[in-house]
A protein has these predicted regions:
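Residues at secondary-structure transition points
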Residues: 1, 26, 30, 48, ...
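N-terminal helix-turn-helix DNA-binding module of bacterial transcription factors
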Residues: 1-60
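Short acidic/polar active-site loop segments enriched in Thr and Asp
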Residues: 13, 59, 120, 181-183, ...
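Active-site-adjacent beta->alpha loops and helix N-cap segments on the catalytic face
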Residues: 131-138
Length: 330
């Protein structure tokens, strides 16, 4: 049941039905009575979202937590959410975390937060190919911003992302500047937006520098043991340096070298991605690409606030570059 159906039954416009629910004092008594009769006749139950999204009375921003997120490590999410929550608090909003049902029920979780709490908007993360959330929210006129690009389909909605390709390209160029010519890439299986983006940066930099790529890209899930097996394949090709799509994958290079009686360093360099809390604690300490998560959180909140103020403004996309943090592993 929708506002449009009530409007058709009452013979009025959609805005008139919205006014009857949110601001009845704006309507003539006869019109208000006609709309209320249609509501009763159809059994329409106004969602709190119909009121909250109009008045922003709830001042709540929803953030759905998926049961598993293999592409967004927990330390990354923790720092991002801290920055996002601080920015929301300064603007007078609260970020509400809610569990997202897996599979086909995922969107139901978003609908429930709209129905039960009237969230003003949503912040998404962990976007990937086939992600239905952006299109679903866009079709319903619900304000949202994503930490992550729209990797497939129509590019809808505002987003902030980190330029993974720029990061891995910078890593390759740094390693090449140290004299490495056989530089491998330890990434995730093909098909992930974030993973393919990071692989693309490695490949483009290698080609621009005239360095061979054939046989020097291996894939593994974000699991240390499987990453070790993949890293051993790279080691067998004679590479002298590796760029990894995550710090977890970089751990596989550490372990593969240790099994071979060696260790990371100038002769077997590695650069990870995410600059997780474990990176400086490893021995030798891990060089890594740090995402500007504080800036991402602030930018996400700014875009969402702008969208709440003006639903019709052009979409805005912000792409930030990671920082190469050098340590002992190179």
């Amino acid at each position: 049941m929708t506002l449009e159906m009530v409007a058709a039954r009452a013979g009025v416009g959609r805005q008139t039905v919205s006014n009857a629910i949110n601001s009845p004092e704006l309507l003539r008594p006869q019109t208000l009575e006609r709309v209320r009769h249609a509501i009763d006749e159809l059994g329409y139950r106004p969602h709190r979202a119909a009121q909250a999204l109009k008045t922003r009375a709830s001042r709540l921003i929803g953030y759905g937590i998926r049961s598993s997120s293999t592409r967004v490590p927990t330390p990354v999410l923790d720092q991002f959410l801290h920055s996002l929550s601080e920015a929301a608090d300064r603007a007078g909003y609260r970020v509400v975390l809610f569990a997202v049902a897996p599979g086909d029920d995922e969107l139901t979780s978003y609908q429930q937060l709209l129905d039960e709490h009237g969230a003003d908007g949503f912040v998404l993360s962990g976007t990937d190919r086939g992600d239905r959330r952006q299109g679903w929210l866009h079709e319903r006129g619900v304000p949202f911003v994503a930490f992550g690009r729209t990797w497939s389909g129509k590019d809808v909605g505002d987003w902030v992302d980190v330029d993974g390709a720029a990061g891995t390209s910078a890593a390759v160029r740094h390693l090449a500047g140290l004299g490495h010519r056989r530089i491998g890439f330890l990434g995730w299986p093909k098909g992930s937006g974030v993973g393919d983006d990071r692989a693309r940066g490695w490949q483009s930099a290698m080609r621009e520098l005239g360095l061979p790529t054939r046989g020097r890209r291996v894939a593994s899930p974000d699991d240390p043991e499987q990453a070790t097996e993949a890293a051993e394949k790279l080691l067998a090709t004679g590479v002298t340096a590796v760029v990894a799509a995550s710090d977890t994958l970089a751990l596989g290079w550490y372990q593969a070298l240790r099994r071979a009686g060696r260790g990371p360093g100038p002769e077997a360099a590695v650069i990870g991605f995410d600059d997780s809390p474990i990176a400086p604690l490893l021995f030798p300490s891990l060089s890594s690409l740090a995402q500007p998560l504080d800036a991402v959180g602030r930018a996400c909140m700014r875009l969402l606030l702008d969208r709440l103020r003006d639903r019709d403004r052009p979409t805005e996309h912000i792409l930030l570059e990671p920082e190469l943090v050098l340590r002992e592993s190179v």
